[in-house]
Amino acid sequence: MSKIADDQYFNDEEEDFAKLLEKEETLEKGTIKEGLIVSINENDGYAMVSVGGKTEGRLALNEITDEKGQLMYQKNDPIVVHVSEKGEHPSVSYKKAISQQKIQAKIEELGENYENAIIEGKIVGKNKGGYIVESQGVEYFLSRSHSSLKNDANHIGKRIKACIIRVDKENHSINISRKRFFEVNDKRQLEISKELLEATEPVLGVVRQITPFGIFVKFKGIDGLVHYSEISHKGPVNPEKYYKEGDEVYVKAIAYDEEKRRLSLSIKATIEDPWEEIQDKLKPGYAIKVVVSNIEHYGVFVDIGNDIEGFLHVSEISWDKNVSHPSHYLSVGQEIDVKIIDIDPKNRRLRVSLKQLTNRPFDVFESKHQVGDIVEGKVATLTDFGAFLNLGGVDGLLHNHDAFWDKDKKCKDHYKIGDVIKVKILKINKKDKKISLSAKHLVTSPTEEFAQKHKTDSVIQGKVVSIKDFGVFIHADGIDVLIKNEDLNPLKKDEIKIGQEITCVVVAIEKSNNKVRASVHRLERKKEKEELQAFNTSDDKMTLGDILKEKL
């Protein structure tokens, strides 16, 4: 940098680092001397150091005390100190001497080509003109105007990168600029990014940091981000499962945002697209061998061996509809055979099935059983309308009305999960893959028991148990019998009470529907016929009118 440019770079408001240190850090101009500790006064916290002739300087003991509180020097030990003023008892500093020596050594190391050299250090101090930055034991001055830091924030302890912009051999100071670093770094990053974007071959970088959203890879001193979706052709993956800090990896640049200064890299772009490889080799219906790579509650991801993952939905794991979690059937690393049910290279989707390589339990059941067979099933699910029984790989429905002859009974009130029930197969629906079962058909129905005692036109007697719009139910011989409204005559329905005994005659017995109908009216007609028949066969010469009068 020229003298004119140098003067322009530092405005008039900035004070020389040496002067600032003189005011805030008391690093005043002076000399470094090899002295000798002549006395130590621990009570007052200082030591006297002879720096030549009769001159003795006062040295604060905290400058030569280690982290454990032990003195690093004793009486008569030689020590290098910085003499900051003249007189018989000048102030001397061990730390200033060491710091000044390190700065001077760094200046000599840098030589004349120091400009824009990059250092990385930590902010360890602050004064009114800027900040003190320490790097590898050397202190640098970062003026406020070159810091690119907010004035109202506490930056002590913050690690930064900056460029060296001035060295002062006479005053033993080195000035740095964070602002210049950004300018130089942005220019360099743009140049390297363009170089990467124009490159036709992958370049080798080093993994610098791993985050949940991707990995940062360093190349020629700049960082680029490989988003987790650009790591593998499998799609978004967990970066930690693939890489660790320090790993070498080939990458390609895919974009650079000049406004945000972000370089986007890709790992998967460095290898051939495996989807192009398989699109002509694999078809729906093919059986392939895969390895379980990840298990979620909704399904399983499987690796087909060439950086492509297929998806095995939870519903395609087993014919059992009650798969609570895939981990109950499969484990990570397990090798299995699956059937391809859908392949879409354009959208990079591969769906597979495990259960379709096994016989459908319904088909197996249907081949071994037929309607009318008696089987045993275990209660798997209870609902308001019935129970599902596991029949060994396939479920059958035992509806409430097929479980009990009593239409008011429900399975959930009489069975519990795990109960084993003997049932009869009522129906096998091949189209919908459904099986209907019955438990009540294995026991004699109340109607059948009733039919063994009573025939049509038999006279029965029962008590009224319910009154409906369409008729009256009486309970007779263990079964409810319906008397329709038109069969109640000569009884008046509005006069009938619950618990009232009614005598009637059986008019219908429906065993299949478990129903019995009766009639009071028919009983009356039957009685009339019997009386008329008795009159016709009797020797008594009573008239029909007499008989009717007697009846009334």
From Swiss-Prot:
<keyword id="KW-0687">Ribonucleoprotein</keyword>
<dbReference type="InterPro" id="IPR035104">
    <property type="entry name" value="Ribosomal_protein_S1-like"/>
</dbReference>
<dbReference type="InterPro" id="IPR012340">
    <property type="entry name" value="NA-bd_OB-fold"/>
</dbReference>
<dbReference type="GO" id="GO:0006412">
    <property type="term" value="P:translation"/>
</dbReference>
<feature type="domain" description="S1 motif 1">
    <location>
        <begin position="31"/>
        <end position="101"/>
    </location>
</feature>
<dbReference type="Pfam" id="PF00575">
    <property type="entry name" value="S1"/>
</dbReference>
<dbReference type="InterPro" id="IPR000110">
    <property type="entry name" value="Ribosomal_bS1"/>
</dbReference>
<comment type="function">
    <text>Binds mRNA; thus facilitating recognition of the initiation point. It is needed to translate mRNA with a short Shine-Dalgarno (SD) purine-rich sequence.</text>
</comment>
<comment type="similarity">
    <text>Belongs to the bacterial ribosomal protein bS1 family.</text>
</comment>
<feature type="domain" description="S1 motif 5">
    <location>
        <begin position="372"/>
        <end position="440"/>
    </location>
</feature>
<keyword id="KW-0689">Ribosomal protein</keyword>
<feature type="domain" description="S1 motif 2">
    <location>
        <begin position="116"/>
        <end position="179"/>
    </location>
</feature>
<keyword id="KW-0677">Repeat</keyword>
<feature type="domain" description="S1 motif 3">
    <location>
        <begin position="200"/>
        <end position="268"/>
    </location>
</feature>
<dbReference type="InterPro" id="IPR050437">
    <property type="entry name" value="Ribos_protein_bS1-like"/>
</dbReference>
<dbReference type="GO" id="GO:0022627">
    <property type="term" value="C:cytosolic small ribosomal subunit"/>
</dbReference>
<dbReference type="GO" id="GO:0003735">
    <property type="term" value="F:structural constituent of ribosome"/>
</dbReference>
<feature type="domain" description="S1 motif 6">
    <location>
        <begin position="457"/>
        <end position="521"/>
    </location>
</feature>
<dbReference type="GO" id="GO:0003729">
    <property type="term" value="F:mRNA binding"/>
</dbReference>
<dbReference type="InterPro" id="IPR003029">
    <property type="entry name" value="S1_domain"/>
</dbReference>
<protein>
    <recommendedName>
        <fullName>Small ribosomal subunit protein bS1</fullName>
    </recommendedName>
</protein>
<feature type="domain" description="S1 motif 4">
    <location>
        <begin position="285"/>
        <end position="355"/>
    </location>
</feature>
<keyword id="KW-0694">RNA-binding</keyword>
